[in-house]
Amino acid sequence: MKNIVLGGGCFWCVEAVFERLKGVIDTEVGYSGGNPNPSYESVCNGDGNIEVVKINYDEKQIPLLEILTLFFKIHDPTSIDKQGADIGIQYRSIIFYENEEDKILAQNFIEKQQKIFSKKIVTQISRLQTYYKAENYHQHYFMNHPDQGYCQAVIAPKLQKIQSD
């Protein structure tokens, strides 16, 4: 089993996509990249942390390249600290890797994707230094609250788009 930690806007949205994939063992939303021991409130107030999803996956069933390809389909990797109406440094596009092999794969992936995108890709690639699990009420949010307003307005259409692709 391997882990990759991705930040690409609201962590509810990113988790909702990846927790449904064959080969993904588990997902968990959390925070990374900023001050120690963050809370949702501190992250929203700009403590430097990013909303992220830790994806535990079986690389024999779903390779990292497939995960990154889907990641680039579900968020705008050319947008600086913003995804849709969600604005702030906590929504930046970032790939946190745990080993050099994944770093190189991510770098090569972005290099190839840049040839497709007309705007500059701003997705950062960084070694995972710290990760803090988010509060329990954030875990598997869409799965637990599919009828909530944000879920219906933002997440459900994203899932429908992915399923139709």
From Swiss-Prot:
InterPro entries: Met_Sox_Rdtase_MsrA_dom (IPR002569), Met_Sox_Rdtase_MsrA_sf (IPR036509). Coiled coil: none annotated. The active site is at C10. It is an enzyme of class 1 (oxidoreductase). It comes from the Bacteria. SUPFAM superfamilies: Peptide methionine sulfoxide reductase. GO terms for biological process: protein modification process. GO terms for molecular function: L-methionine:thioredoxin-disulfide S-oxidoreductase activity; peptide-methionine (S)-S-oxide reductase activity. PANTHER family: PEPTIDE METHIONINE SULFOXIDE REDUCTASE, PEPTIDE METHIONINE SULFOXIDE REDUCTASE MSRA 2. Has an important function as a repair enzyme for proteins that have been inactivated by oxidation. Catalyzes the reversible oxidation-reduction of methionine sulfoxide in proteins to methionine. NCBIfam families: msrA (TIGR00401). This is Peptide methionine sulfoxide reductase MsrA. The gene is msrA.
